[in-house]
């Protein structure tokens, strides 16, 4: 709340995580949709807590958002992903790790987070909260432009002291 007091654009939204109603990690998608309801801009930048974008990519991102804001054919932007593994110096590029993913989507009511909030899809059903975030029928992928920018994913990395304590 201290950060919110100094930065008025930050809004803290208190929620309840209902894992019974939204099973199989779809509660992440439901919570993403809940946050989306509080957004007001043309584009939504979505990062999970273990993801960051280096500031060197900000000019590319800003330029693309400005260039395509009036082009309704573009519904989102795809980023390359670097998955750090074990520590902060090693990257895993095996087939088990997604090399690209959407992290910017248009702020449209028919665009919803999908599955476990890994990506976004257009849903023909425009409800605020969907009964099943894993359904493919009646949905489609967003039309997207790939950016020359990366998301660094640290979900599988640990501080060296933590890794050394495992020995």
Question: What name fits each language-model region?
Answer:
Residues 38:
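Conserved catalytic core of Hanks-type protein kinase domains
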Residues 25-33, 54-167:
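Catalytic-site signature of metal-activated, phosphate-bearing donor transferases
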Residues 1-23:
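Acidic donor-binding segment of Leloir-type glycosyltransferases
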Residues 44:
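Short aromatic/hydrophobic "clamp" motif used to bind/position activated sugar donors
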Residues 48-52:
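The conserved acidic donor/metal-binding loop of glycosyltransferases
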């Amino acid at each position: 709340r201290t950060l919110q007091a100094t930065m008025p654009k930050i809004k803290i939204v208190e929620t309840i995580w209902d894992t019974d109603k939204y099973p199989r990690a779809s509660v992440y998608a439901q919570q993403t949709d809940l946050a989306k309801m509080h957004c007001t801009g043309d584009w939504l930048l979505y990062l999970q807590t273990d993801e960051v974008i280096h500031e060197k990519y900000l000019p590319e991102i800003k330029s693309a958002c400005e260039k395509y804001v009036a082009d309704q054919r573009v519904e989102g932007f795809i980023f390359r992903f670097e998955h750090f593994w074990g520590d902060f110096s090693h990257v895993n590029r095996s087939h088990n790790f997604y090399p690209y993913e959407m992290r910017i989507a248009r702020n449209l009511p028919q665009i919803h987070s999908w599955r476990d909030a890994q990506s976004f899809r257009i849903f023909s059903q425009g409800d605020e909260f969907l009964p099943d975030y894993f359904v493919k029928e009646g949905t489609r992928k967003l039309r997207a432009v790939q950016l020359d920018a990366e998301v660094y994913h640290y979900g599988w990395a640990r501080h060296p002291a933590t890794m050394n304590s495992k020995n």
